Amino acid sequence: MAPPWVPAVGFTLLPSLGGFLGAQYTRGEGFRWYASLQKPPWHPPRWILAPIWGTLYSAMGYGSYMIWKELGGFSKEAVVPLGLYAGQLALNWAWPPLFFGTRQMGWALVDLLLTGGMAAATAMAWHQVSPPAACLLYPYLAWLAFAGMLNYRMWQDNQVRRSGRRLSE
């Protein structure tokens, strides 16, 4: 049997795995494309994003461990709170390929809005089980709102129009 700390570490690190894989889209050609975009003055510097995401991913991961532990593992009672969490995490991981990989800022915004909705539903479900676990999602919800505003602004500011028609992003 695994030591009791193994699930806590695993749950805490899991979100960062997808974040690390998604970060691969921000390198090379994806980074050059992103650097060429118009950005609002309130755009965060690139160097701060990894610490922010690392903190948010660790907090949500540990919160998921708290829910898992409180509900006795992957029990029937855990299906909704952990299912919502898994859904929002999958949507979160889909954003970098959409934004940087396909350069579809509009679809990336749709993904962010869905992620925010699922994350809010996750926080509400977690609150029923463990209010402290739900509190670990609040900074993430705030960051998703900020990221959504930034994504929207960049999408709007970088659309090319000819003859009243939008070109593909």
UniProtKB/Swiss-Prot annotation:
Cytoplasmic side: 27-46, 101-105, 156-169
Membrane topology term: Multi-pass membrane protein
Transmembrane residue ranges: 6-26, 47-67, 80-100, 106-126, 135-155
Location within or outside the cell: Mitochondrion membrane; Membrane
InterPro entries for the chain: TspO/MBR-related_sf, TspO_MBR
Gene Ontology annotations for the cellular component aspect, listed alphabetically: membrane; mitochondrial membrane
UniProt KW Ribosomal protein keyword: no
Stretches assigned to the Mitochondrial intermembrane side: 1-5, 68-79, 127-134
Pfam families membership: TspO_MBR
Keywords of the record: Lipid transport, Membrane, Mitochondrion, Receptor, Transmembrane, Transmembrane helix, Transport
One GO term of the biological process aspect: lipid transport
Family as reported in the entry's similarity comment: Belongs to the TspO/BZRP family.
Subunit structure: Interacts with TSPOAP1. Interacts with MOST-1. May interact with STAR.
Functional description taken from the UniProt entry: Promotes the transport of cholesterol across mitochondrial membranes and may play a role in lipid metabolism, but its precise physiological role is controversial. It is apparently not required for steroid hormone biosynthesis. Can bind protoporphyrin IX and may play a role in the transport of porphyrins and heme. Was initially identified as peripheral-type benzodiazepine receptor; can also bind isoquinoline carboxamides.
Protein name as annotated: Translocator protein
